[in-house]
């Protein structure tokens, strides 16, 4: 790896995903897939208790552990009935119920005297919801009030782009606001005459489908971010050291059933990043526009490790691609929308498991960043830290060195974590509507 040093600008806790207490082992001799009335009742209760949360984890305050929603539903069924249902069975049951909801609502829509535009809007709203959201919307609606007329009965609202705060975290900064997705008018198609009728073209082969990680993780058509961390290491003796993660993103294995990333209007954050040549606005207009993401970190500053001689502050990141390229990674630290320092690193590909991997390992932080962290940690109140962080951003741009094509552009914004379980994050896809 070839890298340059930081250059000043001329401008001024991990939750387990794979089961709990042997949940995926024995099924207590219950027939797999059989949902008796007591299990179904507990399942419905759990749906109302644990709302859909996408790929986020839910922290149980009494245990301090993080669980996925399906895992919590399975635990609830076990506690209420003594019968075991795995999180995979819960997921399958959600999908079955979702298909029933869609089928039932489709029949009701046909029976009602709705115009074509209303039908299309209802199905469009239905298509944008995950199976968990479809089922939960129905459960909560039945519990709270008699269902109003369709199509609002089950689909009272399309999923919001800006979700609620992560448990244990303050709400999002007021200067980054959600935007409403405009309703696109759908014109009913004109029925073709028999003379012009042609059979539909065959579906494209599965091999040409969009990769599962695209639109669900920080990934463009050509490059995917696998890991990212900023950390501090303090040596304890000649062979060991203590490590603290300020921010961290670990590798994930998304599936097609996972929700797509929420969208954020890029114009809301233009003023937080440089506007001159090579700034965020110019980069987005140049495209490709599926390469732009907003990454909000709740940074963990609650370190008990004492800074001292030999302390190392660094950043590590890892990317993967189906193409063999040489990439250039530009990292710009910005204050009040102005670039303060920039570091440019060049990384070459290594073939691993039929994909090309790019690793930037233990890249040293610049002095500006180290001093900034020190001053931030000495502020007496969290709200003071967040006030400072409102004007602090980082812009990372990954390009193909040979073609200068933008492969990934990640805009970082920050708040201070109030959780006892370390750093957390949320990813948004930057769009312009």
UniProtKB/Swiss-Prot annotation:
Q: Where is this region: Disordered?
A: 1-35
What molecular functions are annotated in GO for this chain?
DNA-binding transcription factor activity, RNA polymerase II-specific; RNA polymerase II cis-regulatory region sequence-specific DNA binding
Q: Which Pfam families match?
A: TEA, YBD
List, in alphabetical order, the GO biological process terms annotated in this UniProt record: embryonic organ development; hippo signaling; positive regulation of transcription by RNA polymerase II; regulation of transcription by RNA polymerase II
PROSITE patterns according to UniProt = TEA_1, TEA_2
Question: Which key words tag this protein in UniProt?
Answer: Activator, DNA-binding, Nucleus, Transcription, Transcription regulation
Which spans does this entry mark as compositional bias, Basic and acidic residues?
14-28
What InterPro entries does the entry give? TEA/ATTS_dom, TEA/ATTS_sf, TEC1_TEAD_TF, TEF-5, TEF_metazoa, YBD
Cellular location(s): Nucleus
Expression sites by tissue: High levels in cardiac muscle, low in skeletal muscle. Intermediate levels in gizzard and lung, low levels in kidney.
User: Which portions of the chain have biased composition (kind: Polar residues)?
Assistant: 1-12
Specify whether Nucleus is a keyword of the entry: yes
Q: Name one GO cellular component term.
A: nucleus
- Provide the residue ranges listed under DNA-binding region in this record: 28-104
Functional note: Transcription factor which plays a key role in the Hippo signaling pathway, a pathway involved in organ size control and tumor suppression by restricting proliferation and promoting apoptosis. The core of this pathway is composed of a kinase cascade wherein MST1/MST2, in complex with its regulatory protein SAV1, phosphorylates and activates LATS1/2 in complex with its regulatory protein MOB1, which in turn phosphorylates and inactivates YAP1 oncoprotein and WWTR1/TAZ.
Designated name of the protein: Transcriptional enhancer factor TEF-5
This chain's source organism reads: Gallus gallus
Designated gene of the protein: TEAD3
